[in-house]
Amino acid sequence: MADGRASSAQSGENLLFLTDEQLRQGIEAMFFAYRGFTADPDRILSDMAYGRAHHRAVHFINRAPGTTVNNLLNILGVTKQSLNRVLRTLIEDGLVESKVGKADKRERHLFLTEEGHALEQKLSDAQRVRMRMAYREAGPDAVAGFRRVLEAMMDREMRNAYGRLKDSGT
Amino acid sequence: MADGRASSAQSGENLLFLTDEQLRQGIEAMFFAYRGFTADPDRILSDMAYGRAHHRAVHFINRAPGTTVNNLLNILGVTKQSLNRVLRTLIEDGLVESKVGKADKRERHLFLTEEGHALEQKLSDAQRVRMRMAYREAGPDAVAGFRRVLEAMMDREMRNAYGRLKDSGT
DNA sequence: TTGGAATGTCAACAACACTGACATATGCTG
DNA sequence: CAGCATATGTCAGTGTTGTTGACATTCCAA
């Protein structure tokens, strides 16, 4: 199983495809690529009092304005205490606004302020530059495959969340 | 630039391909997929005194037995203090062996013990299960594209490290 | 022999996650 | 209205992983 042969019975067409070696290369590619993926925003954030967690919060609030805390919690997959620490600083610093819900006053709806939008732009611009280069270098067919594999790699709930966001974006 | 149109001048063929919206979907796919990617090993590790950093160390020592601390440092992209804390516990617990170099006695060459191999197997088995399912679901062409985009997303040094590991694996 | 490289270690600190407990306000249901 | 559930916020404690900075040891090479 660890000697380079296929690690499970495969039909002939797959014997040369799903070897442990091929899978391990994919695993390592994910590891190295994710480092690159986060490197640029991380560099920007390290000059401020913010970190990757702030980036994620700002990204998804921008993506789904008016989202509730609970919804954000589900998307980010962290505890409310962890998210709250991040949201508190963002609200204190005037990047995020929290509005009491109209229908249900227990809920808080989150919005980016102008300043919050500015940060989001700065971070996502940096991340898009790399993404655009990678997409252009690899070509449209590769991008389609890239997306298909990533989707298949997600947990079910994350795939659902991803689908909802994808559909909401025009 | 944030209104959904392509964010940089593109030739016609790319106007429908590299919109900010498409790029953002790719960014979110990476985020959600990476969560799935690490979920299974993380679950296993949380039952021990180990974390993701231990997994990474064990993975690359297994991949390149006899690697030096410095080499591992470059691959993992962390400080020696951070790596050392992880290596120390792995050595203390008898999962990793550190051998003084023959040619250069300053160097330490790292190897997995039997117990270390057992943990590596357990972790990478879990990770491969998900990878294999994703690969199978997406198909060979998608996988090729997946790998091409990921490679294009890496920093140069990481792409080099990745290439060396890839070539070393038969 | 001296300088520098490789390694290891100590201390302090920060970011980010977790659990557990508790408070507050609100909504819903009987 | 009473009681329970939900949504949010907060406090305290803890763990993992990363960082800087400082310093010691060992050893190679000029």
Predicted segment positions?
Chain A
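Flexible interhelical turns and helix-capping residues at alpha-helix boundaries
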Residues: Y34, P65, L76, K80, ...
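Exposed, interaction-prone assembly regions rather than primary DNA-binding/catalytic cores
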Residues: A144-T170
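Hydrophobic/aromatic-rich alpha-helical bundle segments in the mid-to-C-terminal region
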Residues: L18-D20, M131-D141, A161-G169
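N-terminal leader segment of winged-helix/HTH proteins
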Residues: M1-M48
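N-terminal helix-turn-helix DNA-binding core of bacterial DNA-binding proteins
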Residues: A39-S82, D93
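Charged, amphipathic alpha-helical coiled-coil/dimerization segments
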Residues: A2-N14, T38, R88-E151
